[in-house]
Swiss-Prot record:
The active site is at D19. Belongs to the MrnC RNase family. This is Mini-ribonuclease 3. One of its GO terms (biological process) is rRNA processing. Pfam families: Ribonuclease_3. It is found in: Cytoplasm. One of its GO terms (molecular function) is rRNA binding. Its cofactor is Mg(2+). Involved in correct processing of both the 5' and 3' ends of 23S rRNA precursor. Processes 30S rRNA precursor transcript even in absence of ribonuclease 3 (Rnc); Rnc processes 30S rRNA into smaller rRNA precursors. Homodimer. InterPro entries: Mini3_fam (IPR008226), RNase_III_dom (IPR000999), RNase_III_sf (IPR036389). It comes from Gloeobacter violaceus (strain ATCC 29082 / PCC 7421). Keywords: Cytoplasm, Endonuclease, Hydrolase, Magnesium, Nuclease, Ribosome biogenesis, RNA-binding, rRNA processing, rRNA-binding.
Length: 135
C-alpha cells in the first residue's frame, strides 16, 4: 500500500489492523515451549490486554522515529468509545500502540519487526503487566 493510501485510512482502521498484528505475533511467540491450550490463552491475554499495550506504547516512545512518534500521538488522540471497565488514558495508549503497529504493517515490515522485537524484549524482562521503568 502506498503512503497516500495509508494516510487515507482512519486511525481506527489502523488500530483494527494493528490489534490483529499484535495478537498474531503474541500467539506465535507463546507457542514454545509447548503447553496446554489454556496456558497459551492465558499468556496471550496477559500480553494483548489494553494495560499491557499501553505500557508497551510508553516504553517504545524513546525508540521511535519522528514519524512513528507522530503516528503514536495521532493514535492516542483518535476518537472512539472507551469501554467502561478501562481507564480512558490506558485505552487511548493501547489504541495508539495498535495504530502504530497497523501503520508499520502496511508501511514498513522490517521496522515492524524491530518494534515487535523491542516489545518482546520488554515483556520478557518485565512481564506483560509490569509498570514501565518510566512509571
Amino acid at each position: 500500500m502506498d503512503p497516500v493510501q495509508i494516510r487515507s485510512l482512519s486511525l481506527e482502521a489502523l488500530a483494527y489492523l494493528g490489534d490483529a498484528v499484535w495478537e498474531l505475533h503474541v500467539r506465535t511467540r507463546v507457542l514454545l515451549p509447548p503447553r496446554r491450550l489454556q496456558w497459551l490463552h492465558g499468556d496471550t491475554v496477559a500480553c494483548v490486554r489494553a494495560s499491557a499495550q499501553a505500557k508497551l506504547a510508553t516504553c517504545l516512545s524513546p525508540h521511535l522515529t519522528v514519524e512513528e512518534a507522530d503516528w503514536l500521538r495521532r493514535g492516542r488522540n483518535a476518537g472512539g468509545t472507551v469501554p467502561r471497565r478501562l481507564d480512558p488514558a490506558t485505552y487511548r495508549l493501547a489504541t495508539a500502540f495498535e495504530a502504530l503497529l497497523g501503520y508499520l504493517f502496511l508501511a514498513d515490515r522490517d521496522r515492524l519487526g524491530v518494534i515487535l522485537h523491542l516489545c518482546d524484549e520488554f515483556q520478557h524482562h518485565h512481564g506483560p503487566d509490569t509498570p514501565s521503568p518510566e512509571a
